[in-house]
């Protein structure tokens, strides 16, 4: 079973607007986000990644590109990796939303919440888990490494799903822009190797890097 590298897209300027992005298209990486993406590509260039999947939203595709280029892989867009459908909340002011009566439910009991005209967290978690499980079935060799580039809440929801954590606790996890979370999935369960890591990723030193450094044994 594979090692999943769950990567959050790089920084963008939309966050400065103070609005909830949801599935908004047309959000591109800013200068810092581009540097984060390039750092990911450099850090993963010697890791034998078999495939790279990405949310089709621009901020994710642009983050995946340096990794794909370094590994000479084609990015596989996966619609089910899009961020949560927040319905009529998309593009709304977070400052205003935080003062709504339901905001405490979003933060403390998300399993009970559905975005107006959008998804529930239960539905979005199931969507992400289904997408990852399809990838796992396709890349089922023990040494396969798969990179998956998408969004913060989806990554936290996926980790919660595979580790059997209550959905209501997923907001306790951290997932910064340009970070990597490593999850090893086997028939007996899942192990969280790293959470919210920034380059370099020394724990991923694989055969290709060892060979470059002259450390392989005959």
Could you describe each region identified by the protein language model?
Residues 3-9, 148:
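Short, hydrophobic/glycine-enriched beta-strand segments
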Residues 54-55, 126, 149-150:
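Short beta-strand scaffold positions
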Residues 12, 154-155:
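Short active-site segment of divalent metal-dependent hydrolases/proteases
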Residues 14, 70-129, 184, 193-197, ...:
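Phosphate-handling substructures
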Residues 8, 13-73, 77:
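Active-site-proximal alpha-helix that buttresses catalytic centers in soluble enzyme cores
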Residues 1-2, 84-95, 137, 141-144, ...:
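Acidic, low-complexity terminal tails and accessory targeting/binding regions
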Residues 38-42, 125, 129-137, 159:
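Generic structural signal for well-ordered alpha-helical scaffold segments
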Residues 66, 157, 161:
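Active-site signature of alpha/beta-hydrolase-fold catalytic machinery across serine-
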């Amino acid at each position: 079973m594979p090692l999943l590298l769950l990567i959050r897209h790089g920084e963008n300027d939309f966050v400065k607007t103070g609005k909830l992005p949801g599935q908004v298209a047309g959000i591109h990486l800013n200068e810092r986000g581009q540097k984060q993406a390039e750092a990911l590509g450099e850090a993963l260039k010697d890791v034998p990644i078999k495939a790279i999947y990405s949310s089709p939203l621009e901020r994710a595709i642009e983050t995946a590109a340096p990794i794909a280029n370094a590994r000479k892989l084609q990015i596989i867009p996966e619609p089910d990796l899009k961020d949560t459908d927040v319905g009529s909340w998309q593009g709304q002011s977070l400052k205003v939303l935080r003062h709504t009566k339901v905001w405490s439910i979003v933060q403390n009991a998300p399993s009970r919440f559905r975005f107006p005209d959008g998804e529930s967290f239960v539905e979005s978690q199931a969507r992400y888990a289904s997408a990852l499980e399809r990838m796992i079935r396709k890349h089922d060799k023990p040494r396969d490494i798969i990179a998956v580039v998408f969004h913060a809440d989806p990554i936290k929801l996926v980790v919660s799903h595979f580790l059997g954590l209550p959905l209501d606790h997923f907001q306790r996890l951290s997932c910064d822009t340009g970070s990597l979370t490593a999850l090893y999935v086997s028939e007996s369960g899942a192990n969280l190797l790293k959470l919210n890591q920034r380059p370099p990723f020394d724990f991923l030193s694989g055969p290709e890097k060892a060979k470059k450094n002259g450390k392989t044994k005959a």
